[in-house]
Structure formats: C-alpha cells, structure tokens
Curated annotation (Swiss-Prot):
GO terms for biological process: base-excision repair. InterPro entries: Formyl_transferase-like_C_sf, MPG, MPG_sf. Belongs to the DNA glycosylase MPG family. It comes from the Bacteria. Disulfide bonds: none annotated. It is an enzyme of class 3 (hydrolase). GO terms for molecular function: alkylbase DNA N-glycosylase activity; DNA binding. This is Putative 3-methyladenine DNA glycosylase. Keywords: DNA damage, DNA repair, Hydrolase. The keyword DNA repair applies. Pfam families: Pur_DNA_glyco (PF02245).
Length: 191
C-alpha cells in the first residue's frame, strides 16, 4: 500500500521511525528497484545540522513542504542524498534515508553500483541513490503519486527492534538521538 500524504504530515522523529521496514520503490527503465528502509535520520529547522537551519534557500525550499515530497541534494561534489519531507507546510523537516536492504531488481542495482557485493549495494545514503538512480531530477518529486519513486507500507516494527542513536557524518547537532535503524540488520550503514 502506497503511503499517503497524512503519513508524512507528522513530526519528523515519528516519521523517521515509522519509515523503518517500509519499501522505497524506484521505477527505472521498465524495472522495479525496491529496497526495505532499514536506517533513517531526522532533521528539522531548529536543528543546527539541518539544511534549513539558517532559513529557506533555493537548495532547501522543498523541505518547507508540502510533506510527502522527495528532497534530493548533491553533496561533497559527487554524491546525492535522498530525504523525505515531513511535517506541516512551512516548517522544514525531512528524513534522510540512510540505508536500504535490497529486495527487488538486485541485478540492476548491482550494475548501477558497479558490481558491489549485496551487503554494500544500498548501505549508505550515497550508495542507495546511486543504486536506485536517484538524482536531482527527482528533487521535489511527489512520493504519494505512486509513480517513478514512492514508498509503500511495511510491517510495523516493535520499539525494542529499533536502535536509537546519534547521527553520522555531521559536526553540528551530532549529540542528538535522531538516527534510527533496525536492530541486527546487516544492511545498516554503520552500527
């Protein structure tokens, strides 16, 4: 079942947890590339690590709503990262999808990733965007439309099966417990 806009129109910390075990689906050249979401990070406008911390810009304007849209950005001059916009319109919030467990289209994902091992295919933000062919053309894409790029419902996850920890690869706000991942999942980027 496709996740509706109401799913995303909630607090970023709730959505970040609830996205775990859901499926990110990418329609690519007539094929479905699917990964189960196993790791997320939450960002909101009052968070110094958030792209919207200093206000709205051309780069981050998608974060200000409406919820349920893709926020894709280019980083380090070589990688894309994929986020899901959450919360109310006008309040910048997004969930970074950090890692996926490959489910379908694995051979195509391997080709897009240059033949990496299955464990390494989608186990990081830049890896998953490369493996699912997500780039700036999908920035602002409506994830509730059910075409090209969208998220479908997964099985709920028990609280005891979710690890809550600090985020990775940031300097500001690094002490905030805004990273969530499925316990004992081998596709998580880092434990």
């Amino acid at each position: 079942m496709l996740l509706p806009r109401q799913f995303y129109a909630r607090d970023v910390l709730i959505v970040a947890k609830d996205l775990l075990n859901c499926y990110l689906v990418r329609e690519y050249n007539g094929h479905l590339l699917i990964g189960k979401i196993v790791e997320t990070e939450a960002y909101h406008q009052n968070d110094p690590a958030c792209h919207a911390y200093r206000g709205k810009t051309k780069r981050n304007e998608v974060m200000f709503g409406p919820p349920g849209h893709a926020y894709v950005y280019f980083t380090y001059g070589m990688h894309y990262c994929f986020n899901v916009v959450t919360g109310a319109i006008g309040r910048a919030e997004a969930v970074l999808i950090r890692a996926l467990e490959p489910v379908k289209g694995i051979d195509i994902i391997k080709t897009l990733r240059g033949g990496k091992s299955e464990r390494e295919l989608l186990s990081g933000p830049a890896k998953l965007t490369q493996g699912l062919a997500i780039d700036l053309k999908l920035n602002g894409h409506d994830l509730t439309g059910g075409k090209i790029l969208y998220i479908t419902k997964g099985e709920p996850v028990a609280e005891e099966d979710i690890v809550v920890t600090t985020r990775i690869g940031i300097n500001a706000g690094k002490d905030l417990p805004y990273r969530f991942y499925l316990k004992n999942n081998k596709y998580v980027s880092k434990k």
